[in-house]
Each structure stands twice: as C-alpha cells, then as structure tokens.
C-alpha cells in the first residue's frame, strides 16, 4: 500500500477556487484496504460536480492520491483553535457515503 498524507490531498483540493474547506479521511475498501474520501464545503455553498473537483486536483496529485468520492457539507468542523476534526469527518463520511 501507498502512504497518503491527508494534508497533502487537502492542500491540493483547497487550490480549487470553489473549495472553501475540506478534510480527507480513509474508509474501508474491499479492493484496496482503504479509499480516500474528501468532506468538502464550498465557497458560499456553490454547487459543483464532484468530478470537477477531482479532475482539478488531478493536476496536482498522483492518481492514487485522488479522492474516490467527495461528500459535501455546509461546514467542515474544526476545533476552536482551527485544528481539523478528523473524527467528525470520518463519521460524516460513513453516514453520507454512496
């Protein structure tokens, strides 16, 4: 398996002007062990296709680092100090995965 750092994927996704904030988590996958899921809030709740976000990130990331799915939320939860709440993101992703 390849080592994927969530922060690297998040940084690439945030370069998309429509992406306001995001967190990346791994969820179980039968084929690869884990699949990358991004929980994304958009600038001013804009509507964008998840395929557009993924293809924009493709310019900055190797294929195996790209999220397999984008799950949209109104706000990405963070602690008062701005620290990412990965536990919330993982639960949110599990509850909203297609």
Segments from the language model and where they lie:
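AMP-binding/adenylate-forming catalytic core of the ANL superfamily
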Residues: 1-65, 91
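Alpha-helix boundary/capping detector
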Residues: 39-40, 79, 83, 96
